[in-house]
Structures are given as C-alpha cells and as structure tokens.
Amino acid sequence: MSKRREFIKSSTIATIGLISLNQNLYSLQRNSDRKIRISLNPGAVGIKCTASELLELAIKYNFDSISPIVSEFQDMDQKEIDSYLEKMSENRISFDVSGLPLQFRTSKNQFNSGLGTLNNHCKVLNKLNVKGFVTWIMPTNNELTYLKNFNIHKERLKECAKIIGNHGMKFGLEFVGPKTLMSRDQFSFIRTINELGELIDAIDEKNVG
C-alpha cells in the first residue's frame, strides 16, 4: 500500500471515491510523467492544517500538487514566499488551482462584497504562479427557475472571469450530477456538459472553460 493511500485511510474522513480508486493509481510515483496530477486539498478530505503542514504532508505522501491556502500567503513577505516555492520546486510539487473566495449563489450584496476579495486573491496567487480558479455549478435550486438561475450565473461569473482575466489567469467551471443533488430542490439546473457549454458561451470570456 502506498504512502498516499495510507494517508487517506488514516484521515478516516476521506471520500468513498478516493478510497475506491484503483490501487495502481496510488502506486504511481509523484515524479512520473503522467498527465493527471494528484492534488492534496485539505478541505476536500476534512483536515485542517497550515500551508507549511500541507506541503509536508504532500511530500510525505507523494502528492503532485497542493491547494494554495491564500490567507496565509497574504501575511508572508516575498522572502518567505520564495522559500516556500523553492521547497515545492525541490520536491517537484506544484500548486493546484484555487476555489472562488466569494459567494456567487446567494444575494447580490454578498456577491458584490466579495469581488474585492477575489481581486486580492488574484494578486496573491500571481505571486505563487497559480494558473487560475475553479468552481462548480449546483444542479438544482429551490427558488430560481432554470432561466433566472442561468442569467444570474452568467452575469456574476462573467464579472468574476473579468477580474481573473485581468490578472492573466483562467477560470474553470464544473458541473456536478450525483442523484442526491439532482433531486434535492424544486428547480432543475445545469447537469450536463452541453448545458455547461451553453453557460460558458453566454459568459463569453476567453479565459473561461
């Protein structure tokens, strides 16, 4: 059993999807030339750690990438950032993309108040050589019809894309479709690749995909 699988098991809160992946995936070495890189995101597996602890875990358990803990890097000076990046490079570990640091599914006021935070995150992530952001699209909504929800997503994600693009970064969108989510609320929303493509076309920004 590889170090990475031992780590996931020891956390006791890893998702079934991670645990059930083929053993051969976990036996791959971090420094191989495979195109798919395995990233350690502490939030995804339910652990709390500092940026330094996250990097040590990635080194110990042979992960290829780590999620940037932006709040910590905001408080670092350039010398500290350079030292962190050097340690990553020595161990052939890169940063994964970042999640959006704002609420775009709730009220307009909450969304607007988060735009400044997004801009500040972009500045920090540029120092870390992070390539962009990613967020997921929920497949249902309990209050908004498909068209109303589509228009809100188009307008708000376009604003996000412009800020992200101004910093030379990309913005990835993901649809999710487990049955538990698809049947949760009253109104259906994006749940297929074709529908997601329509949203990307409507946003109409070159850095969105």
Locations of regions flagged by a protein language model:
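Active-site groove signature of glycoside hydrolases
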Residues: 127-146, 167-182
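N-terminal pre-domain/capping segments
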Residues: 2-132, 148, 154-158, 165, ...
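Short, small-residue-enriched loops and turns at beta-alpha junctions
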Residues: 73-75, 104-106, 140-142, 178-185
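Acidic/histidine-rich catalytic cores of soluble enzymes
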Residues: 65-66, 159-209
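Alpha-helical membrane-embedding segments
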Residues: 152-153, 183
